[in-house]
Amino acid sequence: LWGWRFAAGGFLAVLVLGCASTPPAPPPQPVPPPPGTLYEWNPDGLIGEPSIIIDLRTQRAEIYIGGEHAGWSVVATGKEGFNTQAGDYTILEKVVDKRSTLYGRTVDAYGSTVKADADARRDSPPEGGRFVFAPMPYWMRLTWRGIGMHGGPIPRPGRTASHGCIRLPREFAPQLFEYVRIGTPVRIIR
């Protein structure tokens, strides 16, 4: 009887110790990027078609390849009066070195800027000056009304700044341009 009690007690001790073991650690939480980080891009090893989701509230793009998260980027979308429209789009055209046909700056005869945020429909350059159309490098057209994604300044990350386009950090635009194709889906949400 004593042996049975010992065996039962030993079994109970093993059972209790087994249940009291430390549970597995939860998966690590994503580490927020260092301040000033404008994008993260990790497409290596991912296979499949790209897709992009742009959130107008957070001014951030999420990029997927084959349904797997490949990276994110801050963006600058349309400022008040030039609001970027939510909806489902596809990339219609890709041009490495594109310039706006409406917006830019006026300069005098010496090349000094007279008006920095000029509209060619209403802002004429001074005599001897000219209109310099804004560069939109790595242009990825979303509409035939002049809206697309391209490299450009992000003056205040998290805030709107453009005339309706989706600006990407200048360093990131060529990397994204390389991965997308005509027909890549782009969803813009509020």
Give short role names for the model-derived ranges.
Residues 19, 24-26, 79-86, 105-190:
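Exported/periplasmic cell-wall-interacting domains
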Residues 7-18:
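Bacterial N-terminal signal peptides
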Residues 98-105:
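Short acidic, Gly/Pro-enriched loop/turn segments at secondary-structure junctions
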Residues 1-2:
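N-terminal secretory signal peptides that target proteins for export/translocation
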Residues 57-59, 66-69, 78-80, 94-97, ...:
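Solvent-exposed coil/turn segments that connect beta secondary-structure elements
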Residues 34-51, 56-57, 71-90, 102, ...:
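N-terminal post-signal-peptidase region of extra-cytosolic proteins
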Residues 54-60, 134-136:
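A short, compositionally biased
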Residues 17-38:
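Bacterial Sec signal peptide processing site at the extreme N-terminus
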